């Protein structure tokens, strides 16, 4: 745990973060995230954060050294997608029991599990995750991984990020440190070129990076490694030979980008593929960085030509939606990079942002929101479900974009809702992704079901019926009138 403590302190000292630089030594040791409330929600620990960052590496066997619940509770917490290997969809755990812990069999069981994975699946690497239990009982996973790597002839990488170490964000950064210490730089590619880039902090949710990669392909830009979305182990291992990098989610992997620049002189910038303007700006920045690193300057002209073509196509598709969505009010209850990138994207088509959550956003994210919205009145750290319901039930927003945890608040308030977090089913990146996002918003807002659910329920109309019945003398008179009507009708039909 001594090495883990040292690694945590190193992660908390981040020169690439101006906010971190502005803190004193005591505040820096506390990290960026607020302390967790035990039992408040599932996930959110350092182990969960490490698993989020590394599991999308698709051809690696991810082995959790823990009781079964640790793997079960963290399973499938990101809707990443793979274009090839499916090994990452197989769950591996040592399934420690009380007897294993009491008898000190943890390390031996881990070694046997690595051997079984090697013999059955033959992956290029095995990532071994420590957890609270194995950290507390003192299992030395680094020693076991080193011994297994020598014995079986494959990369066995220790991921020392037990849940008790801290927040999910800390786990993201500890996972990045594991890649830097054990993976990146271990393979020398034989095809490195002047147009190779890395994409950092892109998780390929719902396969959305596949909407961006064709644009880079048309420019002759090769993605050496997308970390972690749809990645392969050998791509990550050779990522140190890229010429430039784009950071998509700095709150998760800023330490990875900064240290790769220090060690291998790979310049990076932070950008977004959400929205037309941001996608175009990201392509320009990538081209400019490559030119600075020696690529032919003609790529700048080709980039502008591609941007003009794609923007024209996208705006033509969006024109029909603009008329239907102009002035519609949106509440964003998300965080991180989406707190500003999606805001910018929606404002491009004339939608009004009534609020955006900054709970998981960095100080830099908040500054971007201020510049986009021109003030900070629409930013909120956290909104209780009761306040959220009150806002939506008073029709202060036409739609809410959030994750699954708050969808039922919107549905209870009879307000359209769209999933925009990691569980989403549709890709929203790039030019085509922007069109898809707007299409989904339009479908949600103009779904005819909302007109029906907002109508008064039949039982809510009961008082009016009682008023009508009150005009009769009493219940008996009503029955008599009905009997007279029935008799008259029977007599009429009988006459025929």
Curated annotation (Swiss-Prot):
Name the UniProt record assigns to this protein: Nitrogenase iron-molybdenum cofactor biosynthesis protein NifE
Domain of life: Bacteria
Species for this entry: Mesorhizobium japonicum (strain LMG 29417 / CECT 9101 / MAFF 303099) (Mesorhizobium loti (strain MAFF 303099))
Family of this protein: Belongs to the NifD/NifK/NifE/NifN family.
GO biological processes: nitrogen fixation; protein-containing complex assembly
Family matches, as Pfam families: Oxidored_nitro (PF00148)
Record keywords, A-Z: Nitrogen fixation
The protein's annotated pathway: Cofactor biosynthesis; Fe-Mo cofactor biosynthesis
GO molecular function, one term: nitrogenase activity
Alphabetical list of SUPFAM superfamilies matching this protein: Helical backbone' metal receptor (SSF53807)
Main function: This protein may play a role in the biosynthesis of the prosthetic group of nitrogenase (FeMo cofactor).
């Amino acid at each position: 745990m001594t090495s883990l403590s040292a690694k945590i302190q190193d992660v908390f000292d981040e020169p690439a973060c101006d906010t971190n630089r502005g803190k004193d030594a005591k505040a820096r040791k506390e990290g960026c995230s607020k302390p967790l409330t035990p039992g408040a929600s599932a996930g959110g620990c350092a182990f969960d954060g490490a698993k989020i960052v590394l599991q999308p590496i698709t051809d690696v066997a991810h082995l959790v050294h823990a009781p079964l619940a640790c793997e079960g509770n963290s399973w499938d917490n990101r809707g990443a997608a793979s274009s090839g290997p499916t090994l990452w969809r197989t769950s591996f755990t040592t399934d420690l029991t009380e007897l294993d812990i009491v008898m000190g069999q943890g390390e031996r069981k881990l070694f046997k599990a690595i051997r079984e994975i090697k013999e059955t699946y033959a992956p290029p690497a095995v990532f071994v995750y420590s957890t609270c239990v194995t950290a507390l009982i003192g299992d030395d996973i680094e020693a076991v991984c080193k011994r297994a790597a020598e014995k079986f002839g494959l990369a066995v990488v220790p991921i020392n990020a037990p849940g008790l170490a801290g927040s999910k964000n800390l786990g993201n950064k500890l996972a990045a440190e594991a890649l830097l210490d054990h993976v990146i730089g271990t393979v020398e590619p034989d095809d490195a070129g002047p147009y190779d880039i890395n994409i950092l902090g892109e998780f390929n949710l719902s396969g959305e990076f596949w909407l961006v990669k064709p644009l880079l392909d048309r420019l002759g830009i090769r993605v050496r490694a997308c970390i972690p979305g749809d990645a392969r182990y050998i791509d990550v291992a050779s990522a140190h030979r890229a010429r430039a990098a784009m950071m998509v989610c700095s709150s998760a992997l800023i330490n990875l980008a900064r240290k790769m620049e220090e060690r291998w002189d790979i310049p990076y910038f932070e950008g977004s593929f959400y929205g037309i303007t941001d996608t175009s700006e990201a392509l320009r920045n990538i081209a400019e960085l490559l030119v600075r690193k020696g690529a032919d300057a003609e790529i700048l002209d080709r980039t502008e030509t591609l941007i003009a073509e794609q923007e024209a196509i996208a705006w033509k598709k969006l024109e029909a939606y603009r008329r239907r969505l102009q002035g519609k009010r949106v509440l964003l209850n998300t965080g991180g990079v989406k707190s500003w990138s999606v805001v910018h994207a929606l404002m491009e088509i004339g939608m009004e942002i009534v609020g955006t959550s900054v709970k998981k956003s960095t100080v830099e994210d908040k500054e971007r929101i201020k510049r986009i919205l021109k003030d900070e009145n629409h930013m909120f750290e956290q909104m209780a479900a009761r306040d959220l319901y009150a806002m939506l039930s008073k029709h202060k927003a036409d739609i809410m974009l959030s994750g699954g945890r708050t969808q039922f608040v919107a549905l209870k308030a009879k307000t359209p809702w769209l999933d925009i977090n990691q569980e989403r089913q549709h890709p929203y990146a790039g030019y085509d992704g922007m069109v898809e996002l707007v299409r989904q918003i339009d479908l949600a807002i103009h779904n005819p079901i909302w007109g029906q659910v907002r109508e008064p329920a039949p039982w809510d109309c009961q008082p009016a019926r009682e008023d009508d019945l009150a005009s009769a003398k009493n219940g008996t008179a009503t029955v008599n009138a009905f009997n007279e009507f029935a008799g008259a009708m029977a007599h009429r039909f009988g006459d025929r």
